[in-house]
């Protein structure tokens, strides 16, 4: 059984997610896309996000609000920030650039918080050990799940209907034979997706697959979408049955069809 520590970490993290004023953040940051350049390594927020929000081994974890997190990140990087601003935003005020970076980091943080919830939920509900670290994240791996004799990467896959080019993940290039599983995730409700499937002239089956995914997700009162226990347990069972034979990229639609149970 999962530890009391893991369950407590999950509950504490969910309380943090529920405390976020998502509507205010969206109104403030959604229109702002002034900082779209690739950030230099010195400004990479991933190590800070892991430091402040991935606390799976702590007995009494606590989590910073986004504003406090951003203040910490900003104050630690005054010199590289000054160089970045002089290079790309000469003549602009620090306030202008700061707001642009706030919006940029908020979008990154929401994505990271989502994958962290999957990891906290996994630790609280599953037996297979999970590993998460910024070094893995930099390779496109949200977490590693260890089975007997192998390790499988996971990557949260947000809902999309665009055709995508098939490109090999950096992690898979470095470790031949290792599998990477896409974990489908949608912000839409099952009812919304079922209705779209009924009305669709194309993509009807895809909408139905996403509706199946949505049945394994839940929504906090503020609208943040989180993973149900049924989701991670379905993925664990899929890995226990198939891990030795999995290799390469396991796309989200196969996961939805074979791993997730129908409602």
Swiss-Prot record:
Its EC number is 3.1.21.4. InterPro entries: Restrct_endonuc_II_TaqI. It is an enzyme of class 3 (hydrolase). GO terms for molecular function: DNA binding; type II site-specific deoxyribonuclease activity. Keywords: Endonuclease, Hydrolase, Nuclease, Restriction system. Pfam families: RE_TaqI (PF09573). One of its GO terms (biological process) is DNA restriction-modification system. The keyword Endoplasmic reticulum does not apply. Only 15% of purified enzyme (upon expression in E.coli) can be sequenced, suggesting the remainder has a blocked N-terminus. It catalyses: Endonucleolytic cleavage of DNA to give specific double-stranded fragments with terminal 5'-phosphates. This is Type II restriction enzyme TaqI. The gene is taqIR.
């Amino acid at each position: 059984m999962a530890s009391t520590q893991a369950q407590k970490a999950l509950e504490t993290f969910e309380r943090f997610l529920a405390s976020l004023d998502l509507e205010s953040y969206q109104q403030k940051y959604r229109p702002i896309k002034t900082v779209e350049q690739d950030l230099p390594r010195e400004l990479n927020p991933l190590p800070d996000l892991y430091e402040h929000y991935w606390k799976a081994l702590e007995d009494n974890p606590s989590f910073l609000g986004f504003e406090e997190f951003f203040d910490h990140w900003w104050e630690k990087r005054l010199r590289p920030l000054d160089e970045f601003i002089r290079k790309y935003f000469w003549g602009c005020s620090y306030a202008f650039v700061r707001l642009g970076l706030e919006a940029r980091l908020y979008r990154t943080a929401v994505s990271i918080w989502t994958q962290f919830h999957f990891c906290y939920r996994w630790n609280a509900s599953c037996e297979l050990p999970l590993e998460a670290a910024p070094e893995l994240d930099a390779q496109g791996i949200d977490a590693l799940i260890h089975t007997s004799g192998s390790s499988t990467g996971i990557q949260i896959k947000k809902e999309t209907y665009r055709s995508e080019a098939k490109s090999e993940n950096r992690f898979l290039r470095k470790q031949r034979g290792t599998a990477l599983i896409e974990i489908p995730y949608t912000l839409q409700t099952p009812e919304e997706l079922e209705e779209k499937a009924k009305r669709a002239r194309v993509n009807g089956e895809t909408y139905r697959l996403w509706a199946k995914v949505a049945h394994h997700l839940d929504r906090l009162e503020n609208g943040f979408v989180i993973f149900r226990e049924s989701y991670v347990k379905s993925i664990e069972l899929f890995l226990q049955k198939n891990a030795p034979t999995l290799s390469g990229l396991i796309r989200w639609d196969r996961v939805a069809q074979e791993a997730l149970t129908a409602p």
